[in-house]
Every structure is written in structure tokens, then in C-alpha cells.
């Protein structure tokens, strides 16, 4: 019996990605500020930008969670209570923390602020979850390493007031719940403070120290090995099982990914969750949704640990992404008099290029443009310049933010 429709929680690395997540159906977003952020490589939000993000999110009836889940040093620990008080005053709906001391201090300093336990904390059992709830946690984000049977038991044995969130889509880490020292050891950039260089994705070869330059055969592609390179998680076919287990929130990984990735994954999981909720006992993920999540940059997909230890959870062929589709442009408006879509270019494309139109909350259409126009209303054969405005004949308006997508040859 599912008591409540699970939340679709999407990443928001910047304002553009925030708008994409909200527009394409996320119930909530998570993002980082300039402090305590596990994605130091992303742009992050200043305090002013954060206040605007909260305002926009609440105007759309959605929720916003702020990440505060790095490993803090002493100076940062002194700053945290005041920072949390400031963001609570802004209207942030919850803070995501990973350190038990931070949890306790935050609960004392701002008792009204909802606190979520990050996957970095490695919550794997009901006892830990229950004790974290006793210390002030409203929600726990479970470790990615848990099978469905363990999730079911954990949900059954924790207090009913404690919510459970799980990752359903995105990159996975070779270390337990992302706690890794490889990046710091090899490059000096600490993954536990948001600066991971992802050495698990690098190319490796075996060499004996007294024979420099002589490589030994452990390679998969004739040159190197990718033995640390995990596949990407995709659980869109199993949302019913997670909901029945007691999961309250379906989380999508990817704050450093593109706005296109954010839009497509949020839209796909929105549609799948709605479909599952209408009839949980007979949920079957449609083919078009399974295909939709393959049209973003991704590695080979896996169900991770959901059904036990993964058999082949690594990508041995390459450390890179699979990219079969890219964004040609984004719809910004409509010229009703001339019946033209107003758009902004994202990648070069031309007249006659078959497109897919990805509409917020309205599925996907196909279209092949026969006429394109530049910003001066002059007919053009192609749109070659990044971020250039252009127009395209189309019989009706499309929602702002609709994506024009094309296959990569």
C-alpha cells in the first residue's frame, strides 16, 4: 500500500538548470550555495541568487533543498549555524547534511529548518536511520549500495514520520556512497569537499616500477583498462517496487550535467511516476520513456545494487559518455502573426534536419523545419552560431523552454 505519491527530485546546478527542472515536472530541486557544497566545479548560487531561486521555486508550488554536505573544517563549522539561519530566513525548505555533529548543531541552531541526511552519510540500516531521526533528521537519503530487500526492511522498521529518499538515476561512484580519496591522493583535489576529478573514469594500464614504459596486458580496448569506471544508474522501470517499499522521494543525480539532461530526466521520471501512481499494481514503464532516458549523455545503464550485487557494473570499453542526441535550440516564444517559433540556438543545424520537439509535461513530437529565419527576418539555410536567436515556421505556439533535439550522426 503506497500512502503518498513519491516526490520527483531533480538537480539544479545553476539558474538555467533550475528552470528546466521546474518546467519539466520536478516536485522539488536540490542545489548548492557557495559554502558547504559537494559540487565545487559547478557555478553554485550566491546568496542573492539563492533567494531568487527560492522565490521562483515557491511561485511554482515546488520545494527547494540546499546541500550542506561537505566534510567541514573547524572554520566552516563556526560559520554553519549563521549560514543555516540565513537560508532558513530565505525560505529554503530543507538543508542536506552528512555529518552527525552538523546535524545536531543545525537542529539546535535552527530547530524549524527541515534536515535531510545526505547519501554521503552512508545510511544502510534502520537503526542508523532511526537514531538520526531522533537527533533531528526529517529524511534520510539512503546509500546507493542497498538492495531492494534491505530498503523494504529499513522502511518497515523506521518511525513513520521519517522520510526515505533514494537515487533512481545518474552517475554512480566506485566508493561506498561517494566517500573516496582517489582524487585527493592523485591530484590534491578532495572529492569529499566537492572537487572530485573523477580518476575512476581515467584510462589505466599496469606497469612494473623497474620496467618503466612497459605495459602489461590487463586492457579492454588494446591500450588501457577502465576497471574503476562504474555504469550509470537507471531505475525508471522499477519505481513501483521502490514506492511499495516505502520510498518517499525519487532522486536524480546530476547537478553538474546540462540543462538538457535535467529537463529530459525530470520529464521522464515525472511521466513515469504519474503513470505508476495511477495504477501501482500494473505499472510497466512505456518503451518511449525507456528510450527517452537514453537520449541524454550517459554511460551504459545498470540497476546498481537494487537486485543484489551488480554482475557487470563497470564500463570496460570507455571512460566517456554515450551521446546520440544533442540540443539544436530552445523555444523562447511565438510570433502569432507570422506563425513562427522564436528560438535560441544551442548547436548548429539546418533546414531539413529532422527534429524532436521535447515539450514540458507534454511528451515529444517530431518535426522537420522547411524554413529558418535569422533575427533580422532573413531566410537562412542553417543556424551556425552559438546562442544566436532564430525563427522557425510552426503552426502553433509551443511552451517556453521546449527543446529542439536532433540525432548526432
What are these model-predicted stretches?
Residues 51, 64, 83, 97-98:
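Phosphodiester-processing cores and adjacent nucleic acid-binding clamps
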Residues 17, 101-102:
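Alpha-helix capping/helix-boundary segments
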Amino acid at each position: 500500500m503506497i500512502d503518498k505519491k513519491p516526490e520527483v527530485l531533480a538537480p539544479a546546478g545553476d539558474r538555467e538548470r533550475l528552470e528546466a527542472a521546474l518546467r519539466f515536472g520536478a516536485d522539488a530541486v536540490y542545489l548548492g550555495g557557495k559554502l558547504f557544497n559537494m559540487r565545487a566545479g559547478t557555478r553554485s548560487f550566491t546568496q542573492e541568487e539563492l533567494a531568487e531561486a527560492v522565490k521562483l521555486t515557491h511561485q511554482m508550488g515546488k520545494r527547494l533543498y540546499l546541500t550542506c554536505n561537505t566534510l567541514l573544517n573547524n572554520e566552516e563549522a563556526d560559520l554553519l549555524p549563521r549560514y543555516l539561519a540565513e537560508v532558513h530566513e530565505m525560505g529554503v525548505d530543507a538543508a542536506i547534511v552528512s555529518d552527525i555533529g552538523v546535524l545536531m548543531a543545525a537542529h539546535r541552531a535552527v530547530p524549524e529548518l527541515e534536515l535531510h541526511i545526505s547519501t554521503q552519510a552512508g545510511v544502510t540500516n534502520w537503526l542508523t536511520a532511526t537514531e538520526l531521526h531522533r537527533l533531528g533528521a526529517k529524511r534520510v537519503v539512503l546509500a546507493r549500495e542497498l538492495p531492494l530487500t534491505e530498503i523494504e526492511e529499513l522502511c518497515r522498521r523506521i518511525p513513520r514520520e521519517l522520510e526515505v529518499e533514494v537515487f533512481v538515476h545518474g552517475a554512480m561512484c566506485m566508493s561506498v556512497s561517494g566517500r573516496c580519496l582517489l582524487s585527493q591522493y592523485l591530484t590534491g583535489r578532495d572529492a569529499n569537499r566537492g572537487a572530485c576529478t573523477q580518476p575512476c573514469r581515467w584510462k589505466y594500464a599496469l606497469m612494473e616500477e623497474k620496467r618503466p614504459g612497459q605495459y602489461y596486458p590487463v586492457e579492454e580496448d588494446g591500450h588501457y583498462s577502465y576497471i574503476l569506471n562504474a555504469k550509470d544508474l537507471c531505475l525508471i522501470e522499477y519505481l513501483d517496487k521502490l514506492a511499495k517499499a516505502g520510498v518517499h522521494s525519487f532522486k536524480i543525480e546530476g547537478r553538474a550535467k546540462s540543462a538538457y539532461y535535467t529537463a529530459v530526466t525530470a520529464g521522464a521520471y515525472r511521466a513515469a511516476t504519474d503513470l505508476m501512481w495511477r495504477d501501482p499494481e500494473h505499472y510497466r514503464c512505456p518503451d518511449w520513456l525507456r528510450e527517452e532516458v537514453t537520449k541524454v549523455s550517459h554511460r551504459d545503464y545498470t540497476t546498481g545494487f537494487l537486485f543484489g550485487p551488480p554482475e557487470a557494473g563497470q564500463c570496460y570499453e570507455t571512460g566517456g559518455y554515450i551521446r546520440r542526441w544533442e540540443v539544436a535550440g530552445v523555444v523562447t516564444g511565438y510570433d502569432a502573426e507570422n506563425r513562427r517559433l522564436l528560438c535560441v540556438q544551442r548547436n548548429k543545424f539546418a533546414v531539413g534536419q529532422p527534429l524532436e520537439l521535447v515539450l514540458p509535461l507534454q511528451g515529444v513530437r517530431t518535426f522537420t523545419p522547411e524554413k529558418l529565419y535569422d533575427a533580422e527576418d532573413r531566410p537562412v539555410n542553417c543556424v551556425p552560431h552559438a546562442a544566436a536567436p532564430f525563427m522557425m515556421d510552426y503552426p502553433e505556439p509551443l511552451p517556453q523552454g521546449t527543446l529542439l533535439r536532433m540525432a548526432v550522426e
